[in-house]
Amino acid sequence: EEGWVAHEAQQVKSRKWSADHAKHLIRFRHQDLAMNDFGVGDSFPEMLLINCHNGLGSYQLRAGLYRMVCSNGMIIADAEYGSVKQRHIGFDADSVIQSSRQVIEDASTLSNVVSDWESISLTPEQSREYIKRAAEVRFGDNVDRNILANLNRSRRNEDMGDSMWKTFNRAQEGLMRGGFVNGTTNRNARAITNINTNLQINTDLWAMTSEFAQAVKN
């Protein structure tokens, strides 16, 4: 009734918890938040519903972005979305509905953030520094040239450019999809499929990018 439609679901495979009690992540799209209305070109907001693995009915609502060009989901981590990004609620329909409405209200603010990142052009030096910090979000100190090159690689024409937004998108997709060799460990970086790791990397990357963008502007 609120206009949200589930379009993707993910479940943690665990020997400890049954399927009913395992952690789930469900991504919802809203019929009123189309790309044209949102105004961020190839992306639009989503709502993520995450349950805790204890099976006690505790849930978490977070804001996300879905980028159509690469079918890739991002997770927002910004103080401006504190009322939505990590709200713990009981299994109560009214609480879920009220929180979901906040996602819609914050969509225009989120659009402004993305537009701001689109307007920031990075110098080659700034781009290298950002990619290094992005790599550290997943790999820590185990970062080599091959990782940096792959995180800054344009996988399609839409990814090309020196804006903060384009650079962020390249790094985010590379971190999540992997598919390259980590030269410091000689092991292949696999795609991220674990829900907790997905949340952590996306959250940390968004927060780091927000700080980096602010520093560049200053």
Each model region followed by its residue ranges:
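Intrinsically disordered, low-complexity regions enriched in serine/threonine
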Residues: K13-K16, R27-N218
